[in-house]
């Protein structure tokens, strides 16, 4: 009986040791997992916070100078046709310097489009807090914008007013400029606000009737 008791005691002690080791291993695993998870999440947040600035820096590296183009000379015979007869360099989603989804929009991208000679500037317009803003989306839906931020319509038009018609910021500043708005909203208020902003920023640039 004493032998059986000793064997049973030894068995229980061994089980307790294994259980304790197992608990320690589980604890170590959980702590390591939490540390790794925090590190990965911190790295993700850091990269996302820098993404807006990175997009602008990347554009500066790619487009570091004016292209070899200039404004049209209306006296040249090749420039006497109708507007419809020309190909016009166009920038799609002109405030987007990265992806259309899970990214940022910035006026630095708009400035680069102007600097590179785009004379048709495209924008996707949304209504946020009853104000017209510029954003992007990868889906065709009035109610979904997929960027982390937005650019106010007023800021974008101010950039155009200050950059698109100056020889120091546009290589073809004397060429006609077309603005293409894809308005993703049924909010009538923003239409009036857009009209007021255009009148304020670009009234002296509008082609006469």
Functional labels for PLM-detected ranges:
Residues 2-120, 126-209:
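Long, acidic (Asp/Glu-rich), low-complexity accessory segments flanking structured domains
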